[in-house]
């Protein structure tokens, strides 16, 4: 087994390598003078079981091309098997054509890219839409960050907690967490826009008065909706508001939104490196997925069961 990484998440890749007691593979991943991606594998990989650790987060296109070019370099160097470990899978939100709009299904395009260049297997975490697995012509292991989040939740001292889904689409995830979190009550934020150019209205389904609210989501992008949800929960009498999410995208004006929000703490995983400005926020806490990903990689390499790691799915 050998691990390689591009420039997207070198810190997480190093932590995974440390957990597996191996060193990262020697590869030069940089740029030519005109900005094109330059890759060279600096060690023998012939017949090897290779894992490339690379999130396709921002800069999304650069990181994606790095991954694709690394796969090609390793394939041409006669690696026996190549697994792309993509903790955060970019373009996952472009997974369908809404009302037959003239738009691409970009997640399918990316899947085709990876399959055609020679990836044998995909390992990812909390795909935004699980059906994306069907876009690939190779096996996909979509593992869950929720056990790590749940473990942290169980260690906290919440006051009369209630798990909150920030939208209807996240109900199944929130319900599963609530059940495992001591069968805690659940609330749902129902978001609706009465008509165009009218501000979105948020209604709370459930009683959050005098309770600590735990918002559960798969990702935080600009944080606008999440911060507005926290405001509504506080208006309804919530004591404190905590947000747990796997992927910290934090794009656009996320810093400003979080800085002025009423969220007491945001707990996220290390699938995407945080910008230095975001790291200065006092209410951000990071959990690492390195142990879980290292064990998953070990199991893939040894042809062991992945599903046995999870006694539930969220």
Swiss-Prot record:
Membrane-traversing stretches: none
Record's keyword terms, sorted: ATP-binding, Cytoplasm, Kinase, Magnesium, Metal-binding, Nucleotide biosynthesis, Nucleotide-binding, Transferase
SUPFAM superfamilies in the cross-refs: PRTase-like
Record-listed D-ribose 5-phosphate binding positions: 193, 217, 221-225
Binding, Mg(2+) 2: 167
Transmembrane recorded as keyword: no
Recorded GO MF terms: ATP binding; kinase activity; magnesium ion binding; ribose phosphate diphosphokinase activity
Cofactor (UniProt): Mg(2+)
Catalytic activity: D-ribose 5-phosphate + ATP = 5-phospho-alpha-D-ribose 1-diphosphate + AMP + H(+)
Cofactor note: Binds 2 Mg(2+) ions per subunit.
Similarity comment text for this entry: Belongs to the ribose-phosphate pyrophosphokinase family. Class I subfamily.
Subunit field text: Homohexamer.
NCBIfam families from the UniProt entry: PRK01259.1 (NF002320), ribP_PPkin (TIGR01251)
Protein name: Ribose-phosphate pyrophosphokinase
Species of origin: Blochmanniella floridana
